[in-house]
């Protein structure tokens, strides 16, 4: 794994997991954050112009290594990267499997209700992509079933205290993307 900005690389051993990370200063030189193709980050970045942001993007872990130990090592590496570069805020997208909004209405509603971003931290999906997440009242959501079926990564982000922005996006392929 290599940090193009710092010119560092991991030597030797087997690479079994990785995350796509991009610092704000690097993103500015290369057309912005990936998330900006689906979410309006400009107001957030302007409100917090004194802070340094890191986008946490796609993760990939080799088959046979997917589990808590490798996830913890990846997050330890991310935390070391955050400290090394003196970063303040992490942002990014996470995906739900599938593109059938009706079938995902419980999950979308749960996320919208359980961890909404306060106004100063909120981001909104771009209008031409935006799907309303508040599909039903929380009283109609089977929370136990949702928690069982949410992707592990989204559950981990919730445990870490993430905020959920306003709106979801049907991504390219077979997922609905949610900004966290």
Where are these regions (language model features)?
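Acyl-donor binding region in acyl/amide transferases
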Residues: 23-162, 168-176
């Amino acid at each position: 794994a290599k940090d193009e900005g710092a010119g560092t690389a991991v030597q030797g051993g087997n690479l079994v997991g990785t995350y796509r990370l991009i610092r704000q200063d690097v993103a500015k030189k290369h057309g912005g954050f990936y998330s900006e193709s689906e979410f309006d980050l400009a107001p957030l970045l302007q409100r917090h112009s004194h802070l340094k942001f890191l986008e946490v993007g796609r993760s990939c872990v080799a088959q046979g290594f997917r589990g808590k130990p490798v996830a913890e090592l990846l997050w330890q590496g991310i935390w070391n990267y955050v400290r090394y570069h003196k970063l303040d805020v992490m942002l990014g997208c996470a995906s739900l499997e599938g593109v059938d909004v009706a079938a995902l209405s419980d999950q979308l509603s749960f996320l919208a209700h359980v961890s909404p971003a306060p106004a100063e931290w909120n981001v909104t999906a771009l209008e031409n992509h935006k799907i309303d997440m508040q599909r039903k009242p929380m009283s109609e959501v089977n929370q136990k079933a949702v928690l069982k079926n949410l992707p592990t990564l989204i559950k981990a982000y919730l445990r870490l205290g993430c905020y959920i922005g306003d709106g979801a996006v049907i991504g390219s392929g077979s997922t609905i993307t949610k900004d966290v």
